[in-house]
């Protein structure tokens, strides 16, 4: 009887260990995904309307730019490069992060002649109607910026409410975001339910843009 009881206790112990292992595996997998593959953010501001609305929750891929190259049109999450959040605190995603659309790659010259005129990249005008907020000018003022090596130029889709690269040309980074500060590229909106959908990079908008002189 004693031997049988010991066997039974051993079986109970093995069953408990087995349960703990199988419960722990999914938790570990989720943690690894969160750490290495995906980021999750709540969007508090309207700087990316109507692509992303305040209150939307988005998923980002951490594989770009670590594994895959950034492309013009990507919706990127990045660390605040030089106190941008002091001017655009409502865009804070938690921590010191912002979300914008990538417009210029290293070597690109991004420019606009002001209200009513399109953004040009390396002298080629782009049609941003696929993502820019309706009724908003591509830029309310003129500018011309050449993107330096290791940096990108970003703008919000709601140009009238986005303190983006255009507004920070006087800071230490000249309004450019170091690629090393980009932590992910937007994949999809997952909440609220009526807003579920992919985050389109609209790479086709930039199809005719030539490579920059210093790329």
Task: Give the location of each predicted region.
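Soluble "head" domains of membrane/secretory-pathway proteins
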Residues: 1-16, 20-21, 32, 36-42, ...
């Amino acid at each position: 009887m004693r031997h049988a009881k010991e066997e039974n206790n051993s079986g109970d112990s093995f069953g408990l260990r087995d349960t703990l292992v199988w419960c722990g595996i999914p938790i570990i997998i989720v943690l690894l995904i969160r750490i290495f593959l995906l980021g999750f953010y709540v969007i508090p501001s309207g700087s990316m309307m109507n692509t992303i609305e305040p209150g939307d929750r988005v998923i980002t891929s951490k594989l770009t730019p670590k594994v895959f190259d950034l492309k013009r049109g990507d919706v990127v999450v990045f660390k605040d490069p030089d106190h941008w959040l002091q001017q655009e605190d409502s865009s804070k995603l938690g921590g010191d992060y912002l979300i914008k659309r990538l417009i210029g790659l290293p070597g690109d010259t991004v420019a606009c002649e002001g209200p009513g005129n399109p953004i040009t990249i390396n002298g080629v005008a782009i049609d941003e109607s696929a993502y820019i907020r309706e009724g908003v000018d591509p830029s309310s003022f003129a500018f011309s910026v050449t993107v330096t090596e290791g940096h990108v130029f970003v703008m919000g889709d709601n140009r009238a409410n986005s303190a983006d690269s255009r507004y920070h040309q006087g800071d230490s980074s000249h309004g450019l975001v170091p690629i090393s500060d980009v932590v992910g590229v937007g994949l999809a909106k997952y909440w609220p339910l009526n807003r579920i959908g992919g985050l389109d990079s609209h790479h086709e908008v930039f199809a005719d843009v030539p490579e920059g002189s210093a790329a």
